[in-house]
Amino acid sequence: MEAKIVKVSDSSYKDGLGKKRKHPGNYTPYDSGRSYAKLQWVLSPNSSTQKLEKRRNLDGENKVIVSENHVEKSLVRYFSYYKKTGVPKRVMFHENGEWIDLPDHILCDIRNDLEAKRATIEFNWCGRHFLLDFLHMYRLDLETGVKTQLAWIDIAGKCFFPETFDTLERDGCHHIRGEDPEQHDQREIKLHIEIDVNSGELPRLNLNVVTDESGDNMDDFQAVQRSSNGPNDEASEDSCSRELDDAVEKWDKTETDRFSGVKPAEEELDKDAVKQMFALGAATLGHVESLDVYQFSSEIAKARLSLFQKQADITKKHRGDANIRYAWVPAKKEVLSAVMMHGLGVGGAFIKKSMYGVGVHAANCPYFSARYCDIDDNGVRHMVLCRVIMGNMEPLRGDNTQYFTGGEEYDNGVDDVESPKHYLIWNMNMNTHIYPEFVVSFKLSIPNAEGNILPTTQSRHESSGLTLEGPKGSPSNEPGRVSNGGSGSEKNSSSSRRPRSPIMPFPLLFKAISSKIARKDMDLIIAGYQELREKKVSRKEFYKTLSMIVGDDDLLISTITGLQRSLG
């Protein structure tokens, strides 16, 4: 049977907010020679319900004007989408006629909520407070009340886009600007989604944006259908709807279950699932050149798993819930073989001191742990994916000398009980509450492994001598260099005679200061650095942000000076 493709076309206009980003280009459209049905959805700006009418064009094309309570049916459909979707690996919102990706560090922050399938999730971004409503498929700015359409692509590559963009964004602009929606000049953006509803292959997305400069508003809500089902228009429409529903149901029964992100830690993972977890949580690191996953499967590993499960039963009996989670621990290549035999307690190699205390430090997201990985001679980094019994989690208060629980009611510590990113397993628990299960070895491509470099700059921070902005045309004005300013006499000398510091990668500076500032501040710095890499902020703005977050210019100067000496 010839596969049928359904093409959905949605409409919207440009609202003038946010930054633009090009559509992803890694989806392959279907061959144009295959038969397909085309549904074009355009919502009238001044009508909430429509009358049903059927008419036939001279060219034989069937046109059906659909009558339905569009909002209610859309909500039911969105709820169906939300229940069937896997864990989102990309979340997008619609602004300025473009689909813009939510940054990866934000996805890391809300990862637990995404896995829990929460219908609404709050988050902060660039100093503003937003809410994601997956049920109604919009993003809400909690300060201005502006709503923008929401879409996502789950871990299996399934795409979930709203039916229509028109009324929601127009209402948002009307709310802010006080403009009449009927008179608002809009640009039509058509989003074509092609789905193979018969074949068993994964659906492929073809994003084709068409801009209509005329700005004419459509006066009716139409579903235009071209089908090979024959002259029976109503039957064609019902058949197409059923096929779409069956296709969505088919996703839920097969692929979505297999690829739905992070499974509960009580369940077993395979290598493919671990790779998916890593790809979801470490995308911000850059392009991964190679990725290998090794699972501990020896008899000793099985015995350790048995002991771990017994400890989980004990914790569950006393606490009501063992609270088992997956956690990522950075590791050195030299200790990996010993970890297979003795766990993370081998030789104290994993016991570290940080602002939270002394113990085994782990993270809920590979992005945070990967930044602390050592790089071997081949440029490869290693992490251990562990199951961890967290039990009752103690909120850590920043006492870097703490090495055991603050009370009998606690088992291990976290940075935030509500949404933990950083786990601290105390020394007394590291052999009983941690089960190392996989080793993930990865290598980043050279530009990302080295990181972007700060440019040498001219204007100085008066108290620190840390250069911030360099003269135009100076030979040191290269991307990504950090330099320590010279003496006052050097300031007045020509740029050609000014001494230059060696190149210093950003990640090297971040690693050096990470143990000297609060973890939440370090996360803010990394988030700002990601915005710099995405060219959402200028270098000068990032330098100011870095200085404000650290709050101690002497610390930056001494750290940079020490790193320069080590670089020789």
Curated annotation (Swiss-Prot):
Residues 497-568 form the RST domain. Keywords: Developmental protein, Nucleus, Stress response. The lineage of its organism: Eukaryota, Viridiplantae, Streptophyta, Embryophyta, Tracheophyta. SUPFAM superfamilies: ADP-ribosylation. Interacts with DREB2A, DREB2B, DREB2C and NAC082. It is found in: Nucleus matrix. Disruption phenotype: No visible phenotype under normal growth condition. Probable inactive ADP-ribosyltransferase that functions with RCD1 to regulate oxidative stress, hormonal and developmental responses. May regulate some stress-responsive genes. Seems to play a smaller developmental role than R. Expressed in young developing tissues, such as young leaves and flowers and root tips. In mature plants, expressed in vasculature of leaves and roots. PROSITE patterns: PARP_CATALYTIC (PS51059), RST (PS51879), WWE (PS50918). Induction: By salt stress. It comes from Arabidopsis thaliana. It comes from the Eukaryota. The gene is SRO1. GO terms for biological process: embryo development ending in seed dormancy; lateral root morphogenesis; photoperiodism, flowering; response to osmotic stress; response to oxidative stress; response to salt stress. Residues 1-18 have a biased composition (Basic and acidic residues). Its main location: nucleus. This is Probable inactive poly [ADP-ribose] polymerase SRO1.
